[in-house]
Structure formats: structure tokens, C-alpha cells
A protein has these predicted regions:
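Extracellular/periplasmic helix-loop-helix junctions in multi-pass membrane proteins
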Residues: 269-283
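Hydrophobic alpha-helical transmembrane segments
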Residues: 32-42, 61-75, 118-129, 166, ...
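Selected transmembrane alpha-helices and immediately adjacent juxtamembrane segments
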Residues: 1-50, 124-133, 137-204, 208-209, ...
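Interfacial loop-to-transmembrane junctions
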Residues: 112-125, 279-286
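Membrane-helix cytosolic exit motif
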Residues: 287-305
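Membrane-water interface at transmembrane helix exits
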Residues: 27, 31-35, 80-83, 109, ...
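Mid-bilayer segments of alpha-helical transmembrane spans in multi-pass integral membrane proteins
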Residues: 95-107, 120, 124, 128-137, ...
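Alpha-helical membrane segments and immediately flanking helix-loop junctions
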Residues: 57-112, 211-271
Length: 317
């Protein structure tokens, strides 16, 4: 059983690495090469005033755009190609952890019945507010970030051959780092699924869902999103909402929580290659998700209570 789970997890891990690698490799290479052409400097100059609000240089717009339109790995691939400070990388990591892969993950939310404006407002709002706060509150992190396996930059390449070679090196090391994280993660997740430990975890989560203002039947949806993520866990989550009879209110609250904090293992570990502290990143996501969900649930409950009172009041008068 264990061997079968490991084998299946390895296959899924390799397939995932290949799928994501097809994005991160060309993106890393292309973005690196574009730095030595007039294209990237022109884009940077155009939007750098806006990025300054978030405490970022103009170059940082590239990973933000790629991360939100494609996926987190594309955003990280772009970061690996740019010289940024530790503070800038951390701000980007927080922004991308809240808002990434918008097309696919928003599509999942829509299938479950959550309104489009809710998802976009929460994700883009959290990314923007968190970046502004970190920029204002954190005065350190001014040193240049060192990216995991990627060696410190010694000199700027002066020929196109050297530029392409260094770009290929950055892209290849990025894929290696990706494989070292994704493959073991998929093996572990497969073992957890096959041994039904995710089901056990779902039962443990019941008190948590109540504390967040949701019914117990939302727990499997939360577990799938927290462990596998919105994109990979889409099938499980959509099925869980249908089979467990989750109401639209609870589904919306669950997704408000999950857009702030989902795939907690994978979406945290993949930032390791960027050389930033990942524990604060996880705590920011988790605390924000809990606080936001409780606030929205409380406001929603009060609105429902007031709505129930109105007909009675109107009838008695």
C-alpha cells in the first residue's frame, strides 16, 4: 500500500514538475534575456511610479503580472531573474501568496457559487493592503536577496552568448529547486489521501469551521483547499460542496478564507528558493484568513438577523 502510494505520488510529482516546469523555464529565461533589451526597461519606466506605493521597484511588476495571469511558479520564475532586495522579495511573496493564478482559481470559486467580485476584491485587496503595510512597517531588508541554489551574481554578462548561458543556468536551477520541493510534496499528499488521513483531518477541522462562522459540513472543502490548493483541489472541493450540501453562504466564507490561505504547505515551501523567511509569510496568510473570515461571518450574521426582524416590525406597525 505504502509503495503503491509512493509510486503514484512520484508519478504525480514528476507530471506536476513537467507541467509547471514548462512555464517556469521559458519565463525565467525570457525575462532574464529581456533585461538586456530596450523592452523591459521601457515597461519598468512606465509603471514604476505605481509600484513605488507598494515599496517595489518597477521591475517587480513583471512577477506580479505573470503570477496573477499564469501561476505562482511563473511569478517566482520572474523573481529569480531579477535582482531585488530581501524586503522587495518578501513583499512580492506576500502579494503573490494572496493573489495568483487568478483565471483558474477564480473559475473554481465561480463553479462553487461564489460571486466574482467577492473573490477579486478579497484577493487584490489583500495583496495591495499587505504590501503597503509591510512597506510602511518594515524598515530593514535592504540587502540584495540570494536565491537558494542560484549563486550570487558576480558580473554582468557582456555578450549575447553569455547572457543566454546565464539565463539557461538560472532557469535550469529554478526547475531543479522546483522538483526538489514538488515531488516529495506530492508523494506525501498521496500517502495522506490513500490512508484516509485527510478524512480524519476533516473531522478535526469541524470545531474550527464553527469558530469561523461556518457549519461543520464545510470542513472537507476547507481541508481540500488548505492542503491541495484551489487549482489542484478544485475537483475535491466542488464535489465536497455538492455532496456535503454546503450553503452558498458557507461556500463564500470558505473561499474568503481559502483565497487568503490555501495550499499552506506547497504555497509556502515554494518560496524557499527565494531566500526569504517563510514562517512569517505563513503566519501573515493564516492570521489574515482567520480575521477576515470571522469579520465577514459576523457582519453577514448581523445582516441576516436584521433582515429577519424587518418583516415582524413592519407587520406590527
Amino acid at each position: 500500500m505504502l509503495l503503491s502510494s509512493c509510486k503514484k505520488g512520484l508519478q504525480v510529482g514528476l507530471k506536476t514538475t513537467w507541467t509547471l516546469g514548462k512555464v517556469i523555464f521559458p519565463v525565467t529565461l525570457l525575462v532574464y534575456i529581456l533585461q538586456f533589451t530596450p523592452v523591459l526597461p521601457w515597461v519598468i519606466d512606465l509603471i514604476s511610479p505605481i509600484m513605488g506605493v507598494f515599496g517595489l521597484s518597477g521591475e517587480a511588476a513583471i512577477p506580479l503580472v505573470l503570477g496573477n495571469t499564469l501561476n505562482l511558479y511563473a511569478g517566482i520564475g520572474a523573481i529569480l531573474s531579477i535582482d531585488l532586495t530581501v524586503k522587495e522579495v518578501f513583499i512580492l511573496a506576500v502579494m503573490l501568496s494572496f493573489s495568483h493564478n487568478l483565471f483558474i482559481e477564480t473559475g473554481v470559486a465561480l463553479k462553487v457559487g461564489v460571486k466574482l467580485w467577492v473573490i477579486l476584491l478579497v484577493r487584490l485587496g489583500l495583496a495591495s493592503v499587505s504590501a503597503i503595510l509591510i512597506n510602511l512597517l518594515w524598515k530593514g531588508g535592504g540587502s540584495i536577496a540570494q536565491y537558494g541554489l542560484l549563486p550570487a551574481k558576480e558580473s554582468t554578462p557582456d555578450t549575447w552568448g553569455a547572457i543566454v548561458f546565464e539565463g539557461l543556468q538560472k532557469a535550469s536551477l529554478g526547475i531543479l529547486q522546483l522538483a526538489l520541493i514538488v515531488i516529495p510534496l506530492m508523494v506525501i499528499m498521496q500517502i495522506l489521501k490513500d490512508k484516509k488521513w485527510l478524512d480524519v483531518f476533516s473531522r478535526w477541522m469541524a470545531p474550527v469551521t464553527r469558530g469561523l462562522g461556518m457549519k461543520e459540513n464545510t470542513s472537507m472543502t476547507l481541508v481540500a483547499g488548505l492542503t491541495i490548493g484551489l487549482a489542484y483541489g478544485a475537483g475535491i472541493m466542488i464535489q465536497a460542496v455538492k455532496e456535503d450540501g454546503v450553503s452558498r453562504k458557507d461556500a463564500t466564507l470558505a473561499f474568503i478564507f481559502l483565497v487568503a490561505c490555501h495550499a499552506v504547505v506547497e504555497d509556502t515551501l515554494i518560496f524557499v528558493p527565494l531566500g526569504i523567511p517563510i514562517l512569517p509569510l505563513l503566519l501573515i496568510r493564516l492570521c489574515t484568513a482567520v480575521a477576515l473570515t470571522i469579520v465577514v461571518a459576523t457582519i453577514w450574521k448581523r445582516a441576516e438577523w436584521n433582515k429577519r426582524k424587518e418583516p415582524t416590525y413592519g407587520h406590527s406597525s
